[in-house]
């Protein structure tokens, strides 16, 4: 049967990150997995620490839920209109990394998007990573912070092609670039994200109309982990 490995991330800076991750899991699994025909749900992380997530979601059974052993795993079974929903009793969690990124700078939209789609497919094929944006590509790459106090991120004006003339010398967009696409890579550890980054670069580098591959470096505001896009002698920092 087809399956999918899914990762959920919450920012480390949240003081309630453990509780926030559990809430996110409960909402996503109940709305998007429990409701989907023929699905079951299992945890890839065994041992401590863990959430008793299966028990909480099993309350959907309204008293008809029961514990069992299926596929040599301790699970909760929930009777549903489509048959049964099976879910592991415990779901483990651990530290990971968010926010590895690549920028694909193209002569026009088609070139940038074509390169980004190639990069996204290659990165997504790397075990242990996810690309959290639709199709793996973000057209609205952002900077940390905003002139508005209620916003935590905003458009990166210095790299917007349509703002080149308005910003004048403040524009940081290289000559000839007409569009910038970004891919974001989250993963289980730095080495895994680095491997996905290199796979993405190899897949995209020969795209016609691709002028540059770079990455967002936000002055250390997004984290202390760095992935180098090039070997010694020409390093470019990508924050995670």
Which residues make up each language-model segment?
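An N-terminus-focused feature that recognizes amino-terminal "leader" regions
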Residues: 1-6
